[in-house]
Amino acid sequence: MAATEDVGYIDHPLLTEAFIERRLYQLQLADAAKQGHTLVCLPTGLGKTTVSLLVTAERLEAVGGTALLLAPTKPLVQQHAEFYREALQIPDDKIVVFTGEVRPEDRAELFESAKIVIATPQVIENDLVGNRISLADVTHLTFDECHRGTGDYAYVYIAERYHADAEEQLVTAMSASPGGTKEDIQTICDNLGLDGVEVMTEDDADVDEFTHDTDVEWKRTDLPQELLDIRDG
């Protein structure tokens, strides 16, 4: 995956020209994630989704198949879909969104023809249980907000099915805060079948230039009478 040094954008056959800014830390994380099932830890606002997109582009170009990106909420799914459609030279109708609003029979047909499926995990879990879809041809699976991958959350079942069914497997799991302890992180890795952990923080030199100090301004305001009554009651 080359970078165009003169304008600072990443050059790749599946990427929209002059769209993805070249950031060394994202390239490093993506290169690591291409080597195996990886947990990518990166602070909020620094482009975890871009890292996964770079891996997806490389997998689709080199291996083919379908990419599946899971996010826990409908707004996140829509946000990712908009970004992927802008950033990738793939027809919009080949980047499909699955939520509970899409009929199950329609999802089955769309899954077969899509290059990238972006979905809430509950929908994919239901379709797997109902044998409407197969993960056999999914060559890149991304778990966004992967710290949710515990207990009976749908991520855990989907990961189990993926590792059992997919022929060309690669998992990328993303989170700004995967857990407070090593044990928490290990649980996520075990549940999602991850082999490695890549961490970058705002203190890393390659990341620091893209972070900004936050200015906090405090303002006092008078509470309305009804809230005062509740407080003093």
What are these model-predicted stretches?
Residues 1-233:
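N-terminal helicase ATP-binding lobe
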